[in-house]
Amino acid sequence: MARHSPLYEEHAKAKAHFVDFAGWEMPLHYGSQIEEHHQVRQRAGIFDVSHMGVIDLEGEEATAFLRYLLANDVAKLSDVGRALYTCMLNPQGGVIDDLIVYRVAPTGYRLVVNAATRDKDIAWIKEKGAGYKVSISERPEMCILAVQGPQAIAAAKSIFDEALYAQLEALKPFHFISSPTRDLQIARTGYTGEDGLEIIVPASRATDLWARFVHQGVKPCGLGARDTLRLEAGLNLYGTDMDETTSPLISNLSWTVSWNDADRNFIGRRALEKQLDENVKERLIGLVMEEPGILRNHQKVWLTEDGEGIITSGGFSPTLGHAIALARVPVGEVEKATVERRGKKIPVKIIKPPFVRRGKKTF
């Protein structure tokens, strides 16, 4: 049986078109995926992402444990109220998941993990944390609402009291505020390439909060728009652009691996070092096809001199009005590429992602 978000009835009332996502019945769109995409790029939209997992860690060895568990270094989170993006790797250097970690207390952290991997993630984290003085608790009662777009912060003004709004208005990217009981957490983070907030609240408060944002004119948006927004922003999708068989070094995620402390032997470090010693063989690039047509996942890409690659994420860009894609290709200087469509080779432009930043074309 499919799992439902606590906001399922709200989505049904709004005439959502549902889709199965990792065993969850979630809104794909509420009538027009394209309109929802433009709503976020131009104004503000709200997403229910409560299918994602929330995991709290607490204990005197929580920091030491996460420095071992994660490829990025939580020692960078020098203050409570800061967050970072990281990969969690297996010993072979493959990506078990990508996630955000929040420092909620001097000895406390919160992880937000992907829906498709949440059960696997909690099992892995508990297994690896067994030798550390740390408590690990999944928080299935928490919901996550993402309010995204250039007007997202302004939309929150009438939702929260004056003092709280002043705090969130002053938030820098990857910073957050939370209540003393942690039953309200507001972070300046997102997955759309726009400014915005991600709000974690108990299910008992989520419906009211959702309704108040909608009343302010923030339009509900589904997973379809979320995917086209993240693709335009050049953001990876787990299971598509990387998985347990691919390392961050070939997934445009080298920047999420912290090498600063030579003594920090995080899981997967030796495998990544070996890849570097042997020279990384692949990379992710951006492709743009301005001719009519769609670039699709798993489609082959032919390069002028360095063989062929494969599209990992492809689709139509509503902002640009044509097809874009992320593709994994051999390392090397590549100036031209083609894809096949209806038996013909079609030229595609190679760019460095993102394709869109703050609603504007980047190339």
UniProtKB/Swiss-Prot annotation:
Its EC number is 2.1.2.10. Belongs to the GcvT family. The keyword Transferase applies. The glycine cleavage system is composed of four proteins: P, T, L and H. It comes from Coxiella burnetii (strain RSA 493 / Nine Mile phase I). It holds the Pfam family GCV_T_C. One of its GO terms (cellular component) is cytosol. This is Aminomethyltransferase. It is an enzyme of class 2 (transferase). GO terms for molecular function: aminomethyltransferase activity; transaminase activity. Keywords: Aminotransferase, Transferase. InterPro entries: GCS_T, GCS_T_bac, GCST_C, GCV_T_N, GcvT/YgfZ/DmdA, GcvT/YgfZ_C, TrmE/GcvT_dom1. GO terms for biological process: glycine decarboxylation via glycine cleavage system. It catalyses: N(6)-[(R)-S(8)-aminomethyldihydrolipoyl]-L-lysyl-[protein] + (6S)-5,6,7,8-tetrahydrofolate = N(6)-[(R)-dihydrolipoyl]-L-lysyl-[protein] + (6R)-5,10-methylene-5,6,7,8-tetrahydrofolate + NH4(+). The glycine cleavage system catalyzes the degradation of glycine.
